[in-house]
Amino acid sequence: MFSKIIQSYAKGNLIIQICAGIALGILIGINSKEISEIANLLGILFTSALKAIAPMLVFILILTSICTKDFSQSGVKIKNIIILYIVGTFLASACAILANFFFPVKLVLDGIQATTNPSPAHMGEIFKDLLFKIVDNPINALSSGNYLGILTWAIAGGAALKHCSNEAKQVFIDINEGVLKIVKFVVKLAPFGIFGLVANSVAQTGAQGLLSYTKLLILLVATMLFVTFVINALIVFFYTRKNPFPLIFICLRHSAFFAFFTRSSAANIPVNMALCAKLGIDKEFYGISIPLGATINMAGAAVTIAILSLTAANTVGIEISLLQAFLLSIIATFAASGASGVAGGSLLLIPLACSLFNIDYDIAMKVVAIGFIIGVIQDSVETALNSSTDVLFTAICSKNELNYNIK
């Protein structure tokens, strides 16, 4: 009987389960502060599990990605689309930073006061702090959650192992798969953790806490829509000198719609390939560009990482300099490309960006937990942007005469 319940839960729809957890958490938070305090243990366990797995996830994900990817077969078109993917992701992160400067959001977090570890004020201090974090001992970086150190050693390790044997690379691929399975297991427990977090948040902060979550969600979705209809439109126009919107709306109807519900760029690859075929793009090209885009084209993830990191900074009272904002754009671009194929991957990489501002690791993980609460909508919109942009950029780089008469 018990095993059947577990199997039924494991096969259930995560979105519905999270919604149920949110609704039940609000109900308990309003009616019983005592039960909310007990339920908060589930939230603490969930955030602790995320804190434990996140450093290892970032390290093995980036190391494996660098040492196993092979672009030796890349022709001019593939090189162009790689550049376009990176530029698009960078511009998306830059837009997210500007959006946060114009419409800053502060979260109501229980027990969080103004930071006692402020961000460095001068350029020299910033670079000194960055350098010491970068050259940190790799074991210490993993154990302390120093994501800049983790990132450095992952890149160095991936580059050093680039030319190792296929058998050795397979070992890292298998380890990567193992870590991803653990992450998927932890994420599958999100409804219980979110139930506890929401119950405690409502009991402690009332409607004000939920209102701050709503403002954050609106900012995220609005920024992603801006990237879709303004940034992507400008990229298409400058690349083709043609009206971008017919192609954009085709990509939204035939790619974004499905990606919104699957919440997975990888799962949407067959849909995107079928759309490319209907558009009249060469199979040899989209056969490489679409899977590649599902791996490195992560504009939506960059928006999520940048906005939630800056929201964490706003919450603890850190003022961000222009240099730090520029560095965040670069980090968000790189980190977003490592978020592919991971449920909630962009959320788990937020501590990496937060480390740029000396934000306490516990606070960063509380923001990650809030990301899971609003992720029911945020992750769907993020995936829709990521996946539809794969087709959009593939189409303009293909140089084929496109078929716009698609039903």
Swiss-Prot record:
| Top-level taxonomic group | Bacteria
Catalytic activity, as annotated: L-serine(in) + Na(+)(in) = L-serine(out) + Na(+)(out); L-threonine(in) + Na(+)(in) = L-threonine(out) + Na(+)(out)
- Annotated transmembrane regions: 10-30, 42-62, 81-101, 141-161, 179-199, 218-238, 245-267, 288-308, 316-336
MF-aspect GO terms:
neutral L-amino acid:sodium symporter activity
- GO biological process annotation, one example: serine transport
Which Pfam family, any one of them, does this sequence belong to? Answer: SDF
Q: Which GO terms describe its cellular component?
A: plasma membrane
Q: Which UniProt keywords apply?
A: Amino-acid transport, Cell inner membrane, Cell membrane, Membrane, Symport, Transmembrane, Transmembrane helix, Transport
How this chain sits in the membrane, per its record, is: Multi-pass membrane protein
Q: Where in the cell is it found?
A: Cell inner membrane
Is Magnesium there in the keyword field? no
Q: Which PANTHER family match?
A: PROTON/GLUTAMATE-ASPARTATE SYMPORTER, SERINE_THREONINE TRANSPORTER SSTT
Family from the record: Belongs to the dicarboxylate/amino acid:cation symporter (DAACS) (TC 2.A.23) family.
Q: What does this protein do?
A: Involved in the import of serine and threonine into the cell, with the concomitant import of sodium (symport system).
- Please report the name of this protein according to its UniProt entry: Serine/threonine transporter SstT
Q: Which organism is it from?
A: Campylobacter jejuni subsp. doylei (strain ATCC BAA-1458 / RM4099 / 269.97)
Recite the lineage of the species: Bacteria, Pseudomonadati, Campylobacterota, Epsilonproteobacteria, Campylobacterales
